[in-house]
Structure formats: structure tokens, C-alpha cells
Amino acid sequence: MGCFSLLCLHNLKDWEGLEKIESDTEYFRVPGLFDKIELTKNQLGNAARPRNEEWRVMSEKMKKAEEEAYGMVVNTFEDLEKEYIEGLMNAKNKKIWTIGPVSLCNKEKQDKAERGNEAAIDEHKCLNWLDSWEQNSVLFVCLGSLSRLSTSQMVELGLGLESSRRPFIWVVRHMSDEFKNWLVEEDFEERVKGQGLLIRGWAPQVLLLSHPSIGAFLTHCGWNSSLEGITAGVAMITWPMFAEQFCNERLIVDVLKTGVRSGIERQVMFGEEEKLGTQVSKDDIKKVIEQVMDEEMEGEMRRKRAKELGEKAKRAMEEEGSSHFNLTQLIQDVTEQAKILKPM
């Protein structure tokens, strides 16, 4: 989680105004932030205030551990959210070391390919496929390793990608039997053969995002994925699912202004995907793809901001960069603290 989302949730946990908001769909302004950020209760779910006993117990344990901690290590970098890093330090009254993006520690192509897990597809096949497309033309779609959509929403997403007529890579970690049947019955993969590549299972995300042909990233807004997209310098379509991901969406869209919302309005809880059904239609998916890949001034400015952030991310991890300095400072601080706490 980044400092922006950590501060969002910190400010909401004890905010009395949250209880006064009767509707789960009413937008309200998050208090105590530098930017105007609006969310709904449906988007927060259990993130700000646990709605059941299991989440409440876990939240209390996390709060206790945080209070006892000497400081916090955060996978982010100063140029990304400087005001929110300082705001979180003041709110928590804790030291914070920002040492990211940690994905940049994987410098070799093989390391990037194997980051997180073993890929379900040969990396050379992916790269050769990407090589066949123009620079900044391909949409990379990946909703994370834990996220699941209803069968109807998966179908709408597939149809939206197809109707956009834009080249895409679609990574699908989880498929219902109904969706597998739909792929076969509709001959979907054959239909999009000249346009899209479907990857079943784990994909080398960091490696693929760094390819020059990638022009945008449709993401679930998990923090690691969000930061990997930022580091790659690409614009994003935000499709948050649960936890703090709606906060991450607001950072990308409203603060950094490098992304476009897909239109998701409520969290998808585990096991309730089919009950929730479809949130975004194929037509709306097509529209948002056109918006993020737009070659007019708005789209160009969005891509320019994204590219500049990607360059700043890389500089942060260099020897003279802020994250490199903070990592050195972390080692020194922990060493000094250990000396103080060492029994005589």
C-alpha cells in the first residue's frame, strides 16, 4: 500500500462524519487530504471500518502492531506522493522510509520474467507478439492473482476488448466453467487471433509492461501492479476490486492524472462475484479504451505525465536517488536503534 491510501484510510477510521452518511452509494470527500478525493461506502468495504467480526479482529491486530512499530517501510518513492508521505508521517508520528519501486530491483530480463511466479506462457512468444505491433499501441489487461469477475462481466470485458479493435494482451488467472465454455462456443480466441493474445495463468507482468509496444494498462489497482504500471510509464484504466484499491484508483486518476476510470462502483467480495454480476458493459469498456488510447491532446498529456513519472521512478532507485538514500538511512536507523535496545 502507498502513503496516499494509508493516509486515506487513517483519516477515515476515526472520522465521525462517516457514520452520518446514510447511503452506501453517496460520494463524500475524504477529510484531511491535500486533494479533493471522493469515495463511497460501497467502494471502501472493509478497508476503512470492518463490517464483520473477522475483519475487526484482524484490523485491531494490525493497529496494535503499527502502534508498537518503530517506523514504516513503504514501497513508493518521494516524487510520486511527497505531500502524502509527509502527511502520513505527521498523522502516524512515525518514521517512514520510502524505498521503491522495488520492482526495479529486477534488472535482468530473466528476473523480470520470473518476478512473482513462473509464467504460464513462454516469454519469447509474448515478446515476439509484442514486437509485431507499433509503439504504444497495445493494451495490457491483468486484474491480479486474487481478483475474480462474474462470468457475465468476463464476457463483457472480452467483447469490449474485441470491439475496441485495439491490440491487447489479456491475462486471465481464474475462469469459471461457464466462461471456458463461452470461449469455446464463441470461438473467441480464433476471432481475435489477429488482434489479441489470451494468457491463461501467470504472466511476466513487469517484463511485458516494459515493452515499447505497451500503450496502456488495465489494472485492478493493487498497489504492486499500480506501481509497476507507474514505473513502466504507461497510462492506466482503473478497475479496482477490493481492499484499498479504490483509494489507489483515486491516486492514479485524480492526483497523478495518468489514468481513466472504468466505472466500477463497488467492491467485489470473494465468493460473491456471480451475485454482483456485471458492473461495466462492453460498450463502456470500448469507450474507456478509446479514451485512454486517445491520440488527441488529453490522451497525449496523460501519456506524457505517465512517462515522466516512470523516469522519476527509475531515478529514485539510482545511487543518488531518494529511495537509494532512504534505504541507506533505514539500515543506519535500525542499526542505531538496535544498539540502544541491546541489553547491557
Swiss-Prot record:
Chief location of this protein within or outside the cell: cytoplasm
Enzyme Commission number(s) from the entry: 2.4.1.-
UniProt-recorded name of the protein: UDP-glycosyltransferase 73C4
An MF annotation (GO) of this entry: UDP-glucosyltransferase activity
Organism from which the protein derives: Solanum lycopersicum
Family label: Belongs to the UDP-glycosyltransferase family.
Keyword Glycosyltransferase: yes
Superkingdom classification of source: Eukaryota
Keywords attached to this entry: Cytoplasm, Glycosyltransferase, Nucleus, Transferase
GO CC terms, sorted: cytoplasm; nucleus
InterPro entries given in the database record: UDP_glucos_trans
Tissue specificity field: Expressed in flowers and fruits.
Role description: Probable glucosyltransferase that cannot glycosylate abscisic acid (ABA) and auxin (IAA).
Cysteines joined through disulfide linkages: none
Localization per record: Cytoplasm; Nucleus
Binding site for UDP-alpha-D-glucose: 145, 202-203, 220-228, 242-245
A Pfam cross-reference name: UDPGT
